[in-house]
Design a protein with these regions (language model features):
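Active-site mouth loops of central-metabolism enzymes
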Residues: 51-69, 110-118, 160-163, 213, ...
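Short, well-ordered coil/turn segments that N-cap beta-strands
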Residues: 46-50, 80-82, 107-110, 131-132, ...
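N-terminal active-site wall of soluble small-molecule enzyme domains
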Residues: 61-154, 169-172, 198-201, 284-335
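C-terminal helical cap(s) of enzyme catalytic domains, especially alpha/beta-barrels
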Residues: 195-205, 227, 239-260, 293-302
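Catalytic cores of alpha/beta
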Residues: 118-130, 165-176, 213-235, 240, ...
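Active-site beta-loop-alpha junctions enriched in small/polar residues
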Residues: 11, 55-57, 89, 116, ...
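Glycine-rich phosphate-binding active-site loops on the catalytic face of alpha/beta enzymes
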Residues: 128-145, 182-192, 229-252, 276-289, ...
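N-terminal amphipathic alpha-helix/helix-capping segment at the start of soluble metabolic enzymes
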Residues: 1-60, 246-262, 266-269
Length: 335
């Protein structure tokens, strides 16, 4: 270990010892109950798995989301995530263990404690605060440490996301029989990103291992391309940086898509619930799906889509008037 990673881990060791004094294991260990949310099962299946992350800041970007509200974030993520990751590191990510029960109380998915875990105490603490899984990084742990920590996690019915960043760590993960392996595309030694890491390492993992691609995923195109190599993705910064978190999640997970020809409120609601970002309103009288301005208002009030006005051979004045009156997000012109 060196540079950024070594500094973080050294500071984490100091934090752990201080927290043990502040909140001794003996003070809460008897109150810890095993998890009932199955992290491993949540990532299985034919569909791509998404671990969506609650992250306020990072060493590479600084503060990512000023109005960080874990309850609001969980309320959005619960409609899309397979599992939810919560940063608990205080110094470098402005996280907190207090965020775990907030997210767990709102979202029914398994909650992953994302931290630099080097001591069994941290796993007990994570479960006490309602985490259902934890991250174990082979870049900071030797095999014996990993075995000890994963045994503690499994004894509490918690899942383990085993993180690797190179071939050596991947071989270790296989030898250690890791069930879920996260390939970190970020080099924590210098914070650089290389998506080729997923392309190169994932094929080395057998069919019995769930592969998660971590870091640097910020578009639907990347998700589609890398889904040939990975079973799922851990995504945080790409969404946390956007004011409209709901739309950001949809863009990355489902892509930019439009459902056109909306004429009824229930159509708009169905489109939104299915993941659409844009809703098309046709202002062409000859179209069987044409709407009046009054109908358009009712449709728009039914669901928070970004609405697109569709026109054919319309005058500039007409397009401008309807766009302004309805506050359309975009127009689509034909003719």
């Amino acid at each position: 270990m060196q540079t950024v990673l070594a500094k973080i881990v050294a500071d984490k060791a100091i934090w752990v010892e201080a927290r043990k004094v502040q909140q001794p294991l003996a003070s809460f260990q008897n109150d810890v109950v095993p998890s009932s949310r199955r992290f491993y099962d949540a990532l299985q299946g034919a569909r791509t798995a998404f671990i969506l992350e609650c992250k306020k800041a990072s060493p590479s970007k600084g503060v990512i989301r000023d109005d960080f509200d874990p309850a609001r974030i969980a309320g959005i993520y619960k409609h899309h995530a397979s599992a939810i990751s919560v940063l608990t590191d205080e110094k470098y990510f402005q996280g907190s263990f207090d965020f775990l029960p907030i997210v767990s109380g709102i979202a029914p998915q398994p909650i992953l404690c994302k931290d630099f875990i080097i001591d069994p105490y941290q796993i007990w603490l994570a479960r006490f605060y309602q985490a259902d899984a934890c991250l174990l990084m082979l870049s900071v742990l030797d095999d014996e440490q990993y075995r000890q920590l994963s045994a503690v996690a499994h004894s509490l019915n918690m899942g383990v996301l085993t993180e690797v960043s190179n071939e050596e760590e991947l071989e270790r993960a296989l030898a250690l029989k890791a069930k879920v392996v996260g390939i970190n595309n970020r080099d924590l030694r210098d914070l650089s990103i290389d998506l080729n890491r997923t392309r190169q390492l994932a094929p080395r993992l057998g069919s019995g291992v769930t592969v998660i691609s971590e870091s640097g995923i910020n578009s639907y195109a990347q998700v589609r391309e890398l889904s040939h190599f990975a079973n799922g993705f851990l995504i945080g910064s790409a969404m946390m940086a956007h004011d409209d978190l709901n739309a950001a999640v949809r863009r990355v997970l489902l892509g930019e898509n439009k459902v056109c020809g909306l004429t009824r409120e229930q159509d708009a609601q169905a489109a939104y619930e299915s993941g659409a970002i844009y809703g098309g309103l046709i202002f062409v009288e000859a179209s069987p799906r044409a709407v009046t301005e009054e109908q358009a208002r009712k449709v728009m009030a039914a669901a928070p889509l970004s609405y697109v006005g569709v026109f054919r051979n319309a005058s500039v004045a007409d397009v401008a008037a309807k766009s302004e009156a309805l506050s359309l997000s975009a127009v689509q012109l034909h003719g």
